[in-house]
């Protein structure tokens, strides 16, 4: 590997660490909030944090970050939060994709739907464990998306720019969902 490629890989690794730190902070705050509700809420928010931080290259957030920086942007702290929000949207789409594909593994780890299907079956509940796991997965995915939108809406960037970005993001999600792949 040449030195420029090594440099790029190293820069991406440093960036990933920054995004993961912010992702962890965002999700820790949500886990703390979930403590006001049920243990199950805490558990699935913790599971959301775990799947958000496991592997992944953080390419989508890096595109946001480096586009901003190359365009002259200087607010490092805020753009890292925005990049983390974009990763959360990606996680939301992966959780939904796992549900739609009836997947049991993602990146070598159990999916949300599989984790909670197994939890339900282990606890000997009488109703359908697959349905329970899928229900939790859909809810966790939607929560993830809304956390991302909260991060975007609460950023210190110009509200009109945020509005445009959220609309563009939503349009991309709609297009992806309407195509059904």
Please identify what each model-predicted range represents:
Residues 1-88, 95, 99-130:
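Conserved N-terminal diphosphate/IPP-binding helix and adjacent helical/loop segment
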């Amino acid at each position: 590997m040449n030195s420029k490629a090594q440099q790029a890989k190293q820069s991406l690794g440093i960036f990933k660490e920054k995004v993961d730190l912010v992702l962890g902070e965002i999700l820790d705050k949500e886990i703390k909030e979930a403590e006001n509700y049920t243990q199950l809420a805490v558990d699935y928010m913790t599971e959301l944090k775990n799947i958000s931080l496991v592997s992944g290259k953080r390419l989508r957030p890096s595109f946001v970050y480096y586009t901003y920086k190359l365009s002259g942007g200087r607010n490092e702290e805020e753009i890292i939060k925005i990049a983390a929000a974009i990763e959360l949207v990606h996680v939301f789409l992966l959780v939904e994709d796992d549900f739609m594909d009836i997947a049991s593994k993602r990146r070598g780890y159990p999916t949300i739907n599989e984790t909670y299907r197994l939890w339900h079956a282990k606890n000997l509940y009488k109703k359908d464990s697959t349905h329970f796991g899928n229900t939790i997965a859909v809810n966790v995915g939607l929560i993830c998306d809304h956390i991302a939108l909260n991060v975007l809406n609460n950023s210190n960037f110009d509200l009109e720019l945020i509005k445009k970005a959220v609309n563009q993001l939503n349009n991309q999600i709609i297009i992806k969902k309407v195509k059904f792949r």
